[in-house]
């Protein structure tokens, strides 16, 4: 099998060297070049035709966001963004994911985190090489989304799990959610410093109130709760109503927070009064949990292969019988509301 050809773009020669060395140590990857700024990178993309580009966000002359926008318009290809894990870096990275970057990786902050960060870059480059590239990501919508003004809650809650490609998918879904939407809990695989900014970004585009989940928060209609990244898993529990619970623990299915943990807790807490949704992402996280939800009587949906950036999590769930129906991303928001409506 041919090696994955990678172009590394970073204004720091040290960082280019570190990333390139880590990638070249993997037998499936070949670094074909390194560029110090977007103008140099533009010529190298034309000359070298890489399979994947790793792109620093903060660079001189032209920042990574502007360059990514040009790439996605003129020559769409898999791009992995490399960003500092700061508030400003989070905002820019979320914009990059909206524009069509496959995934983001945090730059190592110190020597102790270098090997872990470099290993993550290698893993995400491999995922990116198999990803479907969206050529119209980040484009302005032709018209404002039509939200369900007649939506009547049935008392069901909605639980959603996503990973690679989930930023665009969740934005697409939640922009259709009205102020009366069912209580919704989300686990999206994302660095800890990004989830608050991500919740705020979703909040600006949705009719619902979207917030980062806090321990003990009461689940209410019209509200969406996003699992904090990093240290805890998000669960739903019964305690004077339905509430969010943040639980410390080891990664489950390779992740913390884990979609499996969320789905299992929803099955236990509400049984058949739920809609479970598994979206684009690599791996198997969420598949077993969604099956548990379906066995408890919940309605379940999976994103279809054609609209996924990475058809991994939904495929795993579908293959074990956890998915009742596969739905395209363009129809997913409406399908969720239909299943959670008192009028169905």
From Swiss-Prot:
Keywords from the named record: Chemotaxis, Cytoplasm, Hydrolase, Phosphoprotein
One MF annotation (Gene Ontology) recorded for this entry: protein-glutamine glutaminase activity
Active-site residues from the entry: 163, 189, 285
Description of post-translational modifications: Phosphorylated by CheA. Phosphorylation of the N-terminal regulatory domain activates the methylesterase activity.
Modified residues (4-aspartylphosphate): 56
Residues annotated as domain CheB-type methylesterase: 151-343
InterPro entries documented for this protein: CheB-like, CheB_C, CheY-like_superfamily, Sig_transdc_resp-reg_Me-estase, Sig_transdc_resp-reg_receiver
GO cellular component: cytoplasm
HAMAP family: CheB_chemtxs
Domain remark from Swiss-Prot or TrEMBL: Contains a C-terminal catalytic domain, and an N-terminal region which modulates catalytic activity.
Family (UniProt): Belongs to the CheB family.
NCBIfam families listed in its UniProt record: PRK00742.1 (NF001965), PRK12555.1 (NF009206)
Name this protein carries in UniProt: Protein-glutamate methylesterase/protein-glutamine glutaminase 1
Gene that this sequence comes from: cheB1
């Amino acid at each position: 099998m041919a090696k994955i050809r990678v172009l590394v773009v970073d204004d720091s020669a040290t960082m280019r060297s570190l990333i390139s060395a880590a990638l070249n140590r993997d037998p499936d990857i070949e670094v074909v070049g390194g560029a110090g700024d977007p103008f140099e990178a533009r010529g190298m993309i034309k000359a070298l035709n890489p399979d994947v580009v790793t792109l620093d966000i903060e660079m001189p002359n032209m920042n990574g966001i502007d360059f990514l926008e040009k790439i996605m318009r003129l020559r769409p290809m898999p791009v992995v963004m490399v960003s500092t894990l700061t508030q400003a870096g989070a905002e820019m990275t979320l914009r990059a994911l909206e524009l069509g970057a496959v995934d983001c990786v945090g730059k190592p902050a110190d020597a102790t985190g270098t090997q872990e960060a470099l290993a993550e870059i290698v893993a995400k480059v491999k995922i990116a090489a198999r990803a479907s590239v969206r050529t119209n990501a980040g484009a302005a919508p032709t018209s404002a989304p039509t939200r369900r003004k007649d939506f009547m809650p049935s008392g069901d809650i909605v639980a959603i799990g996503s990973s690679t490609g989930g930023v665009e998918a969740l934005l697409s879904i939640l922009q259709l959610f009205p102020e009366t939407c069912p209580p919704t809990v989300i686990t999206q695989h994302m660095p800890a410093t990004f989830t608050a900014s991500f919740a705020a970004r979703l909040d600006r585009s949705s009719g619902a109130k979207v917030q980062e989940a806090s321990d003990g928060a009461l689940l209410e209609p019209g509200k969406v709760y996003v699992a904090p990244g990093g240290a805890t898993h998000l669960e739903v529990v019964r305690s004077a109503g339905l509430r969010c619970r943040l639980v410390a623990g080891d990664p489950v299915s390779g992740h913390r927070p884990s979609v499996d943990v969320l789905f299992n807790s929803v099955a236990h807490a509400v049984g058949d009064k739920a809609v479970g949704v598994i979206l684009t992402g690599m791996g198997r996280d969420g598949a077993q949990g969604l099956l548990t939800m379906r066995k408890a009587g919940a309605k379940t949906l999976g994103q279809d292969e054609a609209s996924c950036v990475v058809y991994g999590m939904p495929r795993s769930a579908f293959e074990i019988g956890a998915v009742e129906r596969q739905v395209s991303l363009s129809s997913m928001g409406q399908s969720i509301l239909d299943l959670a409506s008192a009028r169905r």
